[in-house]
Amino acid sequence: MDRQSYLSELKEPVMETQQIKETIEMISEENLDIRTITMGISLLDCVTGDLQTTADKVYAKIMAKAANLVPVADAISDEYGIPIVNKRISVTPVSLLAGADQNLDFRPIAQAMDRAAKDLGVDLIGGYTALVQNGSTPAETALMKSLPEVLDTTERVCASVNIGSTRSGLNMDAVKLMGTVVKEVAMRKPQNAMKLVVFCNAVEDNPFMAGAFWGISEGDVAINTGVSGPGVVERAIAAKPAASFEEICETIKQTAFKVSRMGQFVGKVAADRLDVPFNIVDLSLAPTPAKGDSVAQILETMGLSHVGTPGTTAALALLNDAVKKGGIMAAERVGGLSGAFIPVSEDANMITAAAKGQISLEKLEAMTAVCSVGLDMVAVPGDTPDATISGMIADEAAIGMINNKTTAVRVIPVPGKQVGDTVEFGGIFGTAPIMAINDGNAQQFINRGGRIPAPIHSFKN
């Protein structure tokens, strides 16, 4: 082989017949898919002194930039035989768009976002967001207080609030407020709480809902993709029942590479056809309630009798790290949350474990120290006190703050339900057993107010 041929092969690696066959099997038999193509759109140029005028400009820009998102994604899916499950949009945090209007009524912008999402045919639109890790402006406070009504009167708008970071500490005033807000959101309709995430260390390029927003350091518009393939990873591990931990890690890495390569390919093709930049691939393993599409099942295939048993956190740490190591080699740029999601209601084996009492909130919290995000799609009794929800948020945020990772809470207090009951959300949102929650009282702690300072290791300069 001459030098030119060698360099050409380095630039464009040849996919062997066996690898092609494996990828086809992943799609047809193991639930491999592109979980989302998400277009990020900056709305900073839509700001005016009048919220209704701003809302009109928001609608116009989203419609202009994302006009071909759904047709292009559908065409790529048909052309290459790769399922693309969701087409989504993330936008600039809405709290940044309204500070010049004294009314601070965000409903016109939320309605404009919802109308654009429906008119374009996208599944969800994220970015009804406030970033309050250092403190809250009047606009940000108004946005947080508007969440119960906005999430009840829109269908496709998703919201998030970042209440802390490793560099800033935790805004406990915002934590207290969000405990009340989450409860009010769920009291109107439990499903509304599925569209709200409370973060610590939120990332600016997350393509997954409900926590996606388009950060202010991002460009005007770009494409992000989120891949998924728990079934692919599980089958690869199942084929090696006697493998050592090193061999399991290597197997996961090789599988994650193939999965992420597909995400890179689809994202690049979509960006090229839409004539916008390609940004990142999110390497997350995102489960669904479908059989064989479970992150918990991967952990059980490693040798656990059920998720939640001692060893679960170690198995999840191994999985999360190996997915990152394998996927990062496959993509030009990796970002988002990138890891393994453990949403209770969206994972068939997690649903089973929760229903049988085999996994507790405390064990889930331990798992969040090593997984992609945090307490996700957790249903709790409807009479759970606001302060208890604030305490859950504070605990998760503290894990993220100290460990310099993204953590989050998407908890759903279900009116009229108690431990042992279940609630049906339907579709990819699945079934949620109502989980027991510690009945202690955190009210005095939450009422102290102020901020929990940033950890000592946050001072890097």
Curated annotation (Swiss-Prot):
InterPro entries: UPF0210. Coiled coil: none annotated. Homodimer. HAMAP family: UPF0210. Belongs to the UPF0210 family. This is UPF0210 protein LCABL_10110. The lineage of its organism: Bacteria, Bacillati, Bacillota, Bacilli, Lactobacillales.
